[in-house]
Amino acid sequence: MKIYEGVRIMKKLWLLVLFALVLPLGSIMAQGEMVTELGDGEGALDIIAWPGYIERGDTDENYDWVTDFEAETGCIVNVKTAATSDEMVALMNEGVFDLVTASGDASLRLVYGGRVQPVNIDLVPSYSTVDERLQNAPWHTVDVDGDGTPEHYGVPYQWGPNVLMYNTEVFPEAPTSWSVVFEEQTLPDGDSNAGRIQAYDGPIHIADAANYLMFHNPELGITDPYSLNTDQFAAALDLLRQQRALVARYWHDAFVQMDDFTNEGIVASGSWPFQVNLLQAGGAPIASVFPEEGATGWADTTMMHVNAPHPNCSYLWLEHSISPKLQGDLAAWFGSVPAVPAACTGNELLTDAGCSINGFDNFEQIRFWRTPTEDCGDADDSTTCVPYREWVTNYIAVIGGR
């Protein structure tokens, strides 16, 4: 494994999509008209999704929430998986997809960039069953037109934390801190962590560093890992440069990360419950923990392209996506938390303990991904924070050794 592996390719990709990723929040493109009534399905549906989010039983026949939908609606589902939020934004700019399962660090870019349309929740009858903590969440409910009434730009799908995944043969007891991936140290097996850890291959990882500093360096005054002034941002970058000396590979592909834990000697990394579940199912000595510093996380929203070619099938899927059966099955498969609390009981795959295990009660402790902006979100108009475009360019520099 080499730290440089993939860096050159990812730098080229980021540079190609940088313009699309950093549209200023004020440059709103024309928004499409909200759909007011539905017609017959168009026969197809094209979705951009995280790996593991749209399953049709190919990996495990018990996990299939596509086949019955296709039979009932005639809408044939095509899925394009994306490994990062930046890739999702770039794909949505191509304009050939209907829906995207966007995390909070992509959703507002899509809204203010004019890439998604408001959703008429009256056409999604089960919307009222969505967790009240998510129904009007700021990463998808936005007053774009300034009329004082926020519009919904999607339907909540799943949420959860970014966990610390570790090898139980190296860590007989769960590590309590993210320090194992940020600070050089001797691990319980007697060897250094250098060359045995990973970090996420995306600019939003800067928030993980800021979250760590918020706990360990309170003198920096960080209160929100996504709203950083220049000094706080510089401190986070310094920590990431320190981390770079320890990193064997920056990961963005879930399946590559799983192979690295299985075959390449990686023993600790930030990860998703999806990888933890699959590795454990395969018998690997893997577990995960929610460290003392807390964690960043994701609350994903199914959003509809402003020029969706199959709007009727899109709305049929939006309703299907929040059915308790799908929500529970997906949570069991991915290790996430359902957006619909009713899915937490009576699901054979998830079990009645599943939501608690996956973090249902940790909502307030998770610092959910969102797009960093110059507006610090405070009452002081004189303060400015580092916007996402600078997160992108600086993270490229960090992993490139600068």
Locations of the language-model features?
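Conserved C-terminal helix/tail region of periplasmic/extracytoplasmic solute-binding proteins
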Residues: 365-402
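A ligand-binding cleft/hinge motif common to bilobed small-molecule-binding domains
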Residues: 106-111, 270-285
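Paired acidic/hydrophobic, glycine-rich loop segments that form the ligand-binding mouth/hinge
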Residues: 98-102, 250, 267-272, 287-288
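Short, low-complexity disordered leader/linker segments with a strong preference
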Residues: 1-44, 402
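Mature extracytoplasmic/periplasmic domains
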Residues: 295, 300, 305-370
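Extracytoplasmic ligand-binding site segments that recognize negatively charged/polar headgroups
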Residues: 46-60, 104-256
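Early extracytoplasmic/lumenal segment of secretory-pathway proteins
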Residues: 32-110
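Periplasmic-binding protein-like
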Residues: 126-130, 234-243, 282-306, 351-352
